[in-house]
Amino acid sequence: MKVRASVRKICSRCVALKRHGVLIVLCSNPKHKQRQG
């Protein structure tokens, strides 16, 4: 899980979600997991 100021989709399989006011990017590739912080 990468914690970044600006999260974005890296590939076509990435999905952007908003959980409890925090932007999260999930993907089948675990390297693409990101959280806004």
UniProtKB/Swiss-Prot annotation:
It is found in: Plastid, Chloroplast. InterPro entries: Ribosomal_bL36, Ribosomal_bL36_sp. Keywords: Chloroplast, Plastid, Ribonucleoprotein, Ribosomal protein. The keyword Ribosomal protein applies. It comes from the Eukaryota. Its main location: plastid. One of its GO terms (cellular component) is ribosome. The keyword Phosphoprotein does not apply. One of its GO terms (molecular function) is structural constituent of ribosome. GO terms for biological process: translation. Belongs to the bacterial ribosomal protein bL36 family. This is Large ribosomal subunit protein bL36c. The lineage of its organism: Eukaryota, Rhodophyta, Bangiophyceae, Cyanidiales, Cyanidiaceae.
